[in-house]
Amino acid sequence: MPRIMIKGGVWRNTEDEILKAAVMKYGKNQWSRIASLLHRKSAKQCKARWYEWLDPSIKKTEWSREEEEKLLHLAKLMPTQWRTIAPIIGRTAAQCLEHYEFLLDKTAQRDNEEETTDDPRKLKPGEIDPNPETKPARPDPIDMDEDELEMLSEARARLANTQGKKAKRKAREKQLEEARRLAALQKRRELRAAGIEIQKKRKKKRGVDYNAEIPFEKKPALGFYDTSEENYQALDADFRKLRQQDLDGELRSEKEGRDRKKDKQHLKRKKESDLPSAILQTSGVSEFTKKRSKLVLPAPQISDAELQEVVKVGQASEVARQTAEESGITNSASSTLLSEYNVTNNSIALRTPRTPASQDRILQEAQNLMALTNVDTPLKGGLNTPLHESDFSGVTPQRQVVQTPNTVLSTPFRTPSNGAEGLTPRSGTTPKPVTNATPGRTPLRDKLNINPEDGMADYSDPSYVKQMERESREHLRLGLLGLPAPKNDFEIVLPENAEKELEEREMDDTYIEDAADVDARKQAIRDAERVKEMKRMHKAVQKDLPRPSEVNETILRPLNVEPPLTDLQKSEELIKKEMITMLHYDLLHHPYEPSGNKKGKNVGFATNNSEHITYLEHSPYEKFSKEDLKKAQDVLVQEMEVVKQGMSHGELSSEAYNQVWEECYSQVLYLPAQSRYTRANLASKKDRIESLEKRLEINRGHMTTEAKRAAKMEKKMKILLGGYQSRAMGLLKQLNDLWDQIEQAHLELRTFEELKKHEDSAIPRRLECLKEDVQRQQEREKELQQRYADLLMEKETLQAKF
């Protein structure tokens, strides 16, 4: 018998990826074509997998309490209508059905007093999942079967093929349609040029023609309006919000990971905080009870007789206060002694609100649904199934309504309104934190300081506020009067740089400079010092000109020669000696490195530092100040002017200077083998050839460098000016086309003008010819009419005879 392949089973990660790629290519309507890529799945299973698991809009986070309440209420209202319930909750129908059954099974386990730690919907070993499309994919094995590898390669090849037969046919049809449109357009143009107008028949659209009309157009009213607010004001761009992660937005994987982390923390807190339910599950007691301890109160600190005495004293003080008010006595002494103590302050300390009694609505609804599911037939009669009282408040999330308190009903002997949950507190009644104090009644005024000040302040009473201001003012005045007189006079003398130091200290106190600004300022100081130091060097170091790698000390003449040296020769020897010292110093501190070579690769310019150090120890290098160098420069300039006037030298032109430079430069030849320069007339033919080869190589290197630089600049200019060039080419082409049209129109105009001239000259002749033809025709008609009349008379005559 042939092998029968039954499609279905657990979904693998490879199949999920193929399904997602196929949906991206073929869409969500060609499930048969998508299923042809998956050998073990049918089209119906692929569609169910997409709409039940792979769709990005599916919510896979943990169920919240509001969603569970809404699910149970909607299941009661619309039983078995999961496709209708799913979009209301925001889940899929399979998720709603699965969680509904999970809640019912969990309730049944709790009623049967079974263990509820495990998931009741979890599959047992050997069972087959009836809905594998709603479960996570199984990871791919390391060693895949040949069938799976073949399926994967086939799917990869088919999905990568974007130019199939249908795509080519569509492209061909599109080209034919474009050709037909262009042909019809050309035909209409030719007919219009010939003077034949053809109205294009347009199909009447049923709705709005968006090519002819402007939908929802609202024309502006007539009149002048102020348009100053329409000016665009450029905002400062916040480049911190233009990063790539801000532009891309939050990824779906990051959002789901954050939701999963929240779910884990929620479960952990639920296990830690729901201790009574855990005790109930382990002990089996249906109701959590706790034995209350005996109430122990402290002994009374005042007897009834003492309380009566306090009441009598209060009544007496009240009578005295009223008498003083009626008599008009309002001085500070009487107001202090006769203060009011029988009115309770409105600022009552905040009492801890009682936790409102609540019930587990999810458990009640699940029990009601189970009771309705297991009810017997109503034909037996009897009482109805007992159910818990419930309403439809669980369909929407519950929220507490904020109410404004009623100030009329807030009396001292009622429940404090500022402690009620969800009510707006009144001004002046915000309680102050009082440690180790029982909230209760507090006197409104306490002029004799009997009670602490924390619980007696009532800022809503204007008289109390004024009294406090007067007392504070009086206390401040007495304190200032009690200050001792000054004993000594002091005079403070600030140093010279005190203001600058104070300004720097204030700047340091008020403003903390950024580390980058500090580094930039230090770098600027170092650069300035480097530039200042560089100005003290000679021109060869400042301009980074080539310098000799070795110092030739043989140019010095011996001092003890016969005949002895003249003063001019001695001066020249001093200049040579100073030049040699400067060369040793520069080779030690500022060695020359050609720009074409890297550090450490200059073999020809390597120097012996010990030799330079030894020479500088015998002949130290002396550094001069800027003023000394300026004086020496001025002396040289003066001497040059004297020599120029004495020798009658004029200004040297650039052509003469270049000629002398070329002649001098042609006499010097560089020997690459010896890494030195020599005179050209002293070099051999081989040395000249090597020198020319070296110069050719250097020139080729320069040419290559310049070519690369030119190519880079050309590429940059092409990027910058490519759009302008293409635009210029397009405009030039349009200009040429317009010029051709102008020439063609001018030619046609001249042709029609010549034709008009010929027609104007030929029209009179044609008119004469036509007139002659008409005249001849009239004469012939006249002759024929006359002949007809004669023949008619002859006929009548003959008839009369016979």
Swiss-Prot record:
Homodimer. Interacts with DAPK3. Component of the precatalytic, catalytic and postcatalytic spliceosome complexes. Part of a spliceosomal 'core' complex consisting of CDC5L, PLRG1, SPF27, CCAP1, CCAP3 and CCAP6. Interacts with PLRG1, Lodestar/TTF2, and NIPP1/PPP1R8. Identified in the spliceosome C complex. Component of the minor spliceosome, which splices U12-type introns. Within this complex, interacts with SCNM1. Residues 108-143, 246-278, 408-460 are annotated as: Disordered. There is a cross-link at residues 135, 219, 487 (Glycyl lysine isopeptide (Lys-Gly) (interchain with G-Cter in SUMO2)). One of its GO terms (cellular component) is catalytic step 2 spliceosome. The modification Phosphoserine is found at residues 303, 358, 417. Residues 260-606 are annotated as: Interaction with PPP1R8. InterPro entries: CDC5L/Cef1, Cdc5p/Cef1_C, Homeodomain-like_sf, Myb_dom, SANT/Myb, SANT_CDC5L_II. Residues 118-127, 246-262 have a biased composition (Basic and acidic residues). PANTHER family: CELL DIVISION CYCLE 5-LIKE PROTEIN. A motif (Nuclear localization signal) lies at residues 165-271. One of its GO terms (biological process) is regulation of transcription by RNA polymerase II. This is Cell division cycle 5-like protein. Residues 146-192, 676-701, 761-801 form a coiled coil. Residues 1-56, 57-108 form the HTH myb-type domain. It comes from Rattus norvegicus. Phosphorylated on serine and threonine residues. Phosphorylation on Thr-411 and Thr-438 is required for CDC5L-mediated mRNA splicing. Has no effect on subcellular location nor on homodimerization. Phosphorylated in vitro by CDK2. Phosphorylation enhances interaction with PPP1R8. Induction: By prolactin, IL-2 and FGF-2 in prolactin-dependent lymphoid cells (at protein level). The keyword Coiled coil applies. The keyword RNA-binding applies. Residues 706-800 are annotated as: Interaction with PLRG1. Residues 31-54, 82-104 bind DNA. Residues 200-206 are annotated as: Required for interaction with CTNNBL1. The gene is Cdc5l.
